[in-house]
Amino acid sequence: MLHSITMKTLTYKFIILLFSLLCYTLNSNAYNLRQINNKDGLSNSSILSVGQDENHLMLFGTCDGLNIFDGKDIQIFRSTPSNQAIKGNFIEKIITTQPGTYWIRTNSGLNKMNSQKGEFLFFPEFAGHNFIFTDCQHDLFIYDGIGNLQIFNEKTKQFQSVLIHKSEPIPLSDILDIKFDSQNRLWVYVKNEMYYCFSLYNKNTNQPYIELHEVKHFNKNITKAFADGDYEFIVDQDDILYMISSEAPQITHIADISWLTHQKGDISSIIKYKEDLFISFQTEGVVKLTLTPEKKEPYSIIDLQIHCGVLSMMKDKSQNIVWIGTDGQGVYKYTEEEYTLNSYLFSQ
């Protein structure tokens, strides 16, 4: 009789333990996707760009104007004959610099908008493909279509050229990505087996310039490059994904993602979320690479089941949220369920 009771108790404990482990496993991978589309007030459900300002307002660049989202309501800025605050309705890129200042590249050119100050500037010469980015002091730079690096001068309200020392200008068609890291070094990733590091000098003078600091060699041609802070994610000619940290310049092999690109098409963006990675595709959704160091394969793959192309993606600046801009389904807000471990006290 005692043996039977003991076995029942042990069996009960084992079942509870298995149930607890199952709940932990399920919840550790649980996530929520909230969709925001034209039913919620978006002017258009194709999201070309995503940004966020210092007040944590979300900025969605659509095919029909800029949409500013405060978590509840959406305010729309679009170009109309009676309102030329923003020229052009295809919002291709959004960058925030000074408080309240938005830089918006559209199909018509580059707009500077500060609605609080009533300041609206327009630079039609920067329409088309170019690279727009900021340094650690939030000053705006642009690498234009003819290979010129320029910085916006807040005093003159004009762009001025940044000279390039110890290097020839790099053709825009060869560049995959440009960024400043947290040490204000300028990194340029190109299509061949090299990437460059420049230092910036005399920024606040009439003759700013960059000087080539280092040329780094990669063992294969680079085909894609995506910046996320001090991390750069590069994809080589064989669709192998690597991560480079500018803090401790070393190349980390992530995974062979060739089967993903064959299945889902070209990559549109890559971002780091905690220790995991999000990869979006121009024709078919987003996958999450979850770090699993205890397994043979360091990353497991979760498909977020977004069945359309993804044009833009960013990590929230203050919360554990990923904002996903799609081609036709609006914006998805990704959040994770916090899992809890319950403790049980067993008595015999």
Segment roles from a protein language model:
Residues M1-Q348:
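Carboxylate-rich, polar loop motifs that coordinate divalent cations or form catalytic acidic clusters
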